[in-house]
UniProtKB/Swiss-Prot annotation:
UniProt lineage: Bacteria, Pseudomonadati, Pseudomonadota, Betaproteobacteria, Rhodocyclales
Gene from which the chain derives: argC
Pfam families from the UniProt entry: Semialdhyde_dh, Semialdhyde_dhC_1
Compartments in which it is found: Cytoplasm
Functional note: Catalyzes the NADPH-dependent reduction of N-acetyl-5-glutamyl phosphate to yield N-acetyl-L-glutamate 5-semialdehyde.
Known pathway: Amino-acid biosynthesis; L-arginine biosynthesis; N(2)-acetyl-L-ornithine from L-glutamate: step 3/4
Main localization category: cytoplasm
Keywords on record: Amino-acid biosynthesis, Arginine biosynthesis, Cytoplasm, NADP, Oxidoreductase
Organism of origin: Aromatoleum aromaticum (strain DSM 19018 / LMG 30748 / EbN1) (Azoarcus sp. (strain EbN1))
One Gene Ontology term of the molecular function aspect: N-acetyl-gamma-glutamyl-phosphate reductase activity
EC number: 1.2.1.38
Gene3D superfamilies the UniProt entry points to: Dihydrodipicolinate Reductase, domain 2 (3.30.360.10), NAD(P)-binding Rossmann-like Domain (3.40.50.720)
Name of the protein in question: N-acetyl-gamma-glutamyl-phosphate reductase
GO cellular component: cytoplasm
Keyword rRNA processing: no
């Protein structure tokens, strides 16, 4: 059994992580931390876990995280980087669901996240946890940077086209919509029911902090710079991301065949039949990414539709998938969950 600690178990990604680990046959949850709720039974805060998670929240100081095999950080940005060195030196592997280790250029990270990086020397060794791209490096990772929700949907949608070099890399467009759970569990005006319900809006058009992460991933696939326009939107749903991606083909290619061949051995990427339109509810509560690729009117413009659950494949599920790879387990352990419908 893998001895697991979870730092920050009270947010949406935290409880989703606990839901998945509670049914994982090789997971032994030994500590779940919360500074503000130490002493409270986890199932009192999250009744959905009653009978499956019998631990109480503890403070980070009382968690004995150095005795774990792996520690997940389901915390705000800036927390994992403060504890990473101590854990790594103790031989503990670390999976960060926040953004502390995603961007390799520390100066760029500090610009977008507005804080000084506490462990810049560890950034270079962190492995970006997109299994469909970095599976072999994930196996030996000591520090795993779990991708963001928007970056996961966008990169999986563009990956076959960019890897194959069949699109104009100077002008990629990602038009992406997210449910309100992507903003986290904290109280903010824009996610109040009266503000978000019956409403739909774009935001951060001038620049979203996931932009450099997406661009970094696409450039690694392409082996050169890319031009990317990324516009996120907030929709009145709880969970789900729908990415509509646009690129111009630089060569004539059967895009349906390209996607099917690239993802034929990927457990969690489902390439839909030609002409399909994936829906967010078709992946809800699952670790699936469903994609469909179109060439409207047979033109040289390719449109990719990519949907994920932002809390699962966009966060906790992908983190568990990476843990399975890191510990040489079946990649689907704990993740063989059918989407919830309706």
């Amino acid at each position: 059994m893998i001895k697991i600690g979870v730092v920050g178990g009270t947010g949406y990604t935290g409880v989703e992580l606990l839901r998945l680990l509670a049914r994982h046959p090789e997971a032994n949850l030994v500590a779940i931390t919360s500074r503000g709720d130490a002493g409270m039974p986890v199932c009192d805060m999250f009744p959905s876990l009653r009978g499956r998670v019998d631990l109480r929240f503890v403070t980070p100081q009382d968690a004995a995280l150095d005795r774990c095999d792996v520690v997940f950080f389901a915390t705000p940005n800036g927390i994992a980087m403060q504890q990473a060195r101590e854990l790594v030196d103790a031989g503990v592997r670390l999976i960060d669901l926040a953004a502390d280790f995603r961007i390799r250029d520390v100066g760029e990270w500090e610009k977008w996240y507005g804080m000084k990086h506490a462990s810049p020397e560890l950034v270079a060794e962190a492995v970006y946890g997109l299994p469909e791209r970095n599976r072999e490096r994930i196996r030996s990772a000591r520090i795993l940077a779990n991708p963001g929700c928007y970056p996961t949907a966008v990169q999986l949608g563009f990956l076959p086209l960019v890897e194959a070099g069949v699109v104009d890399l100077s002008h990629l467009i990602a038009d992406v919509k997210s449910g309100v759970s992507g903003a986290g569990r904290k109280a903010e005006v824009h996610t109040l029911f009266a503000e978000a319900a019956d409403n739909f809006k774009a935001y951060a058009v001038a620049g979203h902090r996931h932009l450099p992460e997406i661009r970094q991933g696409l450039e690694a696939m392409a082996g050169q710079g890319v031009g990317l326009t990324f516009v996120p939107h907030l929709t009145p749903i709880i969970r789900g991301i729908h990415a509509t991606l646009y690129a111009r083909l630089s060569t004539d290619v059967n895009v349906q065949k390209l996607f099917e061949e690239r993802y034929q051995n990927e457990l969690f990427v489902d390439v839909l039949p030609a002409g399909s339109h994936p829906e967010t509810r078709s992946v809800r509560a699952s670790n699936l990414c469903r994609v469909a690729v179109h060439r409207p009117q047979g033109s040289d413009v390719v449109v990719v539709l990519s949907v994920i659950d932002n809390l699962v494949k966009g966060a906790a599920g992908q983190a568990v998938q990476c843990m399975n790879i890191m510990f040489e387990l079946d990649e689907s352990l704990g993740l063989d969950i059918l989407p919830v419908s309706p």
